[in-house]
Regions:
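Short alpha-helical
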Residues: 11, 64, 109-113
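A conserved beta-strand-loop-helix scaffold within acyl/acetyltransferase catalytic domains
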Residues: 32-50, 55-72
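Conserved active-site alpha-helix within GNAT-family acetyltransferase domains
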Residues: 85, 101-102, 108-132
Length: 132
């Protein structure tokens, strides 16, 4: 069965929380994703195998011209099949239809090739400050 990519789909909080836990580890937490995305995101994309959510990406925004790519997640059994790249591509295509001019992303060094080569992001100088 093929992977179906859905833009701004109706989010099932349990399903997305499970995917997030699988992709990032840590303790499982049920997150109110649907309401959070409605309040803070310009767009989001899910990758589905039938009814199973196997990938997700989100673009939070500042209310203006900038969006921030967050939560790129692919379930462990679905990795290395270009699902992450396609998620970002669908998200970028959707954002191009909006007033967003800049899409930012922060990533760990081991993801540099994914974001720069596969997804087309350019490197810039940036900073981060841990608050807690």
């Amino acid at each position: 069965m093929a992977i179906d990519f859905r833009v701004r789909f109706d989010v099932d909080d349990v399903q997305l929380s499970q995917l997030h836990h699988d992709a990032f580890g840590g303790n499982y937490e049920l997150v109110p994703w649907g309401s959070r995305l409605q309040r803070h995101s310009k767009s989001w994309v899910g990758a589905f195998h039938g009814t199973v959510l196997c990938g997700f990406v989100n673009a939070a925004w500042d209310g203006g011209k900038h969006a921030f790519l967050l939560d790129t997640a692919v379930a462990t059994e679905w990795r290395h099949q270009a699902i992450g790249t396609r998620l970002v591509s669908y998200l970028v295509s959707d954002l191009r239809t909006t007033d967003i001019e800049w899409l930012h992303v922060d990533y760990e060094e081991h993801l540099a090739e994914f974001y720069s080569v596969a997804c087309g992001f350019e490197s810039t100088s940036a900073g981060v400050l841990r608050l807690k």
